Amino acid sequence: METVSSVPVFARKNVAYAGATLCCLLWGSSYPAIKSGYELFAIATDDIPSKIVFAGYRFLFAGLLLLLFAMAQRKPIARLSLQQYGQIALLGLTQTSIQYIFFYIGLAFTTGVKGSIMNATGTFFSVLLAHLIYKNDRLSYNKSIGCVLGFAGVMLVNVNHSLLDFSFSAMGDGFVVLAAFILSASMLYGKRISQTVDPTVMTGWQLAFGGGVLVLGGYLTGGTLVVHSATAVALLGYLTLLSSIAFALWSVLLKYNRVSMIAPFNFVIPVAGTVLSAIFLGENILEMKYAIALVLVCSGIWWVNKPKA
């Protein structure tokens, strides 16, 4: 029988739950930060190449920061086989580069509300893919109920007149759903790689590589990024820091825990993003739907992780 002390720290449920919540709160805080970043760097709403450059620098710097952190911990960052470098490059290309390109193009052809809801389908993909890949992570009644409740919370926080538009745009909604699927699949691939490569090193390299590809692709398609103030640099620094912490911690959590246990916390992201946007961007926060949405999301997470009777 395993004692508590013999269980890896990040495999302990209370640590895993707290860590996953922190990751999603950090990602949620990127919503208002990115909106402010577009203003500070004077990036137009329809300027997708410049948005890709902006995202690319964020991930490139986050990756380099993680590699420096790994070196400070005396972790070898270059003692990888050619196969491992290839695996990490593929991870960076899919999880960071291709996924974000589809996501940004998709958002340009759909509404923000529908984009947020379509992006939340990623949790379903994660749970379904885990069911197909891992024998100890099968789909269950509790997981199904939890995912439905969490998705309902995401829909509720985005309720407005645009939800009455039931049209489906392949270039818009379809690309956002495709981005969500790519992210889910690549995170499961990252879980596999992290069994033989330190999660911090893996995440650092994949973010740096994927971010570099985004920067290059953004500039080649006409994007620019001009620094107008120290505030803009500070904001990019914050986005860099939150990305490095959240992605590295998420990789560690996936290494030691079942995908279906961690993935539903993603439902917290759009709710946290909406609430934090309301707080920091002066939008209306005193709406009952936010409280109900949070209850639905938390209930969904509880159902997914509810012990079997």
Give short role names for the model-derived ranges.
Residues 12-17, 47-50, 80-85, 159-182, ...:
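Juxtamembrane helix-entry segments on the extracytoplasmic side of multipass membrane proteins
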Residues 40-95, 125-129, 182-186, 203-221:
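Transmembrane alpha-helices of multi-pass small-molecule transport proteins
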